[in-house]
């Protein structure tokens, strides 16, 4: 349990960083799809 408590924040931080980076890159190449998905 102690290992989970120490690794969970690290995994969450990496996951949020990757998600934000993917969204930023997607918005840079396809700026209209985020605002007009249909």
Swiss-Prot record:
It is found in: Cellular thylakoid membrane. The chain crosses the membrane at residues 4-24. Keywords: Membrane, Photosynthesis, Photosystem I, Thylakoid, Transmembrane, Transmembrane helix. The keyword RNA-binding does not apply. Pfam families: PSI_PsaJ. It is a single-pass membrane protein. GO terms for cellular component: photosystem I; plasma membrane-derived thylakoid membrane. May help in the organization of the PsaE and PsaF subunits. This is Photosystem I reaction center subunit IX.
């Amino acid at each position: 349990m102690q290992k989970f408590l120490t690794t969970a924040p690290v995994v969450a931080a990496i996951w949020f960083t990757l998600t934000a980076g993917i969204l930023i890159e997607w918005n840079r190449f396809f700026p209209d799809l985020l605002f007009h998905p249909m």
